[in-house]
Amino acid sequence: MSFQNKNLYDLLGNDVEEDAAPSAPSREVVKKNTSSKKSDAAPASADPAKAKKKKSPTGNEAALKNKNFNKDVAPPQSTATKHSKKPFDRHSRTGKTDSKKKLQQGWGQSDKRELEGEVEGTEDAEAELEAEAEENDESANAIPKKSLQEYLAELELSKQELEGSKKLRQANEGAEQKWTAEEKIEKQQEVFFASTHTKKAKSKAQKEKVFLDIDANFGDEQPQTTRGGFRGGKRGGARGGSRGGAKRGGARGAAKPEVNDKNFPSL
């Protein structure tokens, strides 16, 4: 019985270090000049904007100061809409164009026609002017003449013709004879119950107005107290009132007017 060892990890192929080719050694660069001095190179060009240590303008201020810089910048463009029509929608895609001959046929080559029309128009205008001049000469030579008597006779004839043509309606023309006898028709009410007693209207005589002459006498009004009198009273006046108190019945009023029955007769 033979026995053979197998490396199962060898099947995975993870042993890269042994299979990889050995890397070549790096080449060492040897400089000819071993001095530590810097190479003689030209200095960088200085920026004049950074020399003053100021911030460069931006925005609208930069656009105003640096007008020449904006020439290199493209202007803003409007974005195309999503629903815009195609550029060939309003143009013919057949490739056919109207030639000069077709245009003259369609619209009419009116160069010769316009010239002929102008010539004919001038000829017609000249002929009309000649005809008008002849008519004016004839009318100027033949002036109508008429006497006063002939004119009055013509007026009378025209009046007679006008009066004869008018037909005036005469009075009562076309009246009917049946309406000559006029009758007044009154509506009478039927009496269902005749009353035996007739009501008599009472005649009431009007009363005459009686005017009375009266001598009216009115009592004088109470005397008014004067304004601005002394306030208070005399100092040291008697205390208390009179003995027995105030009189009964109060103060008397103004005198009543005398009434006589003779001045007021009974009605």
Swiss-Prot record:
Which keywords does this chain's UniProt record carry?
A: Coiled coil, Cytoplasm
Q: Which residues form a coiled coil?
A: 112-168
Q: Which GO terms describe its molecular function?
A: ribosome binding; RNA binding; telomeric DNA binding; translation elongation factor binding; translation repressor activity; triplex DNA binding
Q: Which GO terms describe its cellular component?
A: cytoplasm; nucleus
Q: Where in the cell is it found?
A: Cytoplasm
What S-S linkages are listed for this chain? none
Q: Is Cytoplasm a UniProt keyword of this protein?
A: yes
Cite the record's Acidic residues compositional bias ranges. Answer: 117-138
Q: Report the superkingdom from the record.
A: Eukaryota
Major subcellular location class: cytoplasm
Which GO BP terms, alphabetically? negative regulation of apoptotic process; regulation of translational initiation in response to stress; ribosome hibernation; telomere maintenance; TOR signaling; translational elongation
**What InterPro entries does the annotation carry?**
HABP4/SERBP1-like (IPR039764), HABP4_PAIRBP1-bd (IPR006861), STM1-like_N (IPR019084)
Protein family:
Belongs to the STM1 family.
- Say what the protein does: Ribosome preservation factor that protect a small pool of nontranslating, vacant ribosomes in cells under nutrient starvation conditions. Under nutrient-limiting conditions, cells reduce ribosome biogenesis and degrade ribosomes via autophagy (ribophagy) or proteasomal degradation. To avoid excessive degradation during starvation, STM1 binds to and protects 80S ribosomes from proteasomal degradation. Under nutrient-sufficient conditions, TORC1 phosphorylates and inhibits STM1 to prevent formation of dormant 80S ribosomes.
Q: What subunit structure does UniProt give?
A: Associates with mature 80S ribosomes. Binds to the head domain of the 40S ribosomal subunit and prevents mRNA binding by inserting its alpha-helix domain towards the mRNA entry tunnel at the decoding site, where it blocks the binding of tRNA and mRNA at the A- and P-sites. Interacts with eEF2; interaction sequesters eEF2 at the A-site of the ribosome, thereby blocking the interaction sites of the mRNA-tRNA complex, promoting ribosome stabilization and hibernation.
- Name the UniProt record assigns to this protein: Ribosome-associated protein STM1
**Which organism is the protein's source?**
Candida albicans (strain SC5314 / ATCC MYA-2876) (Yeast)
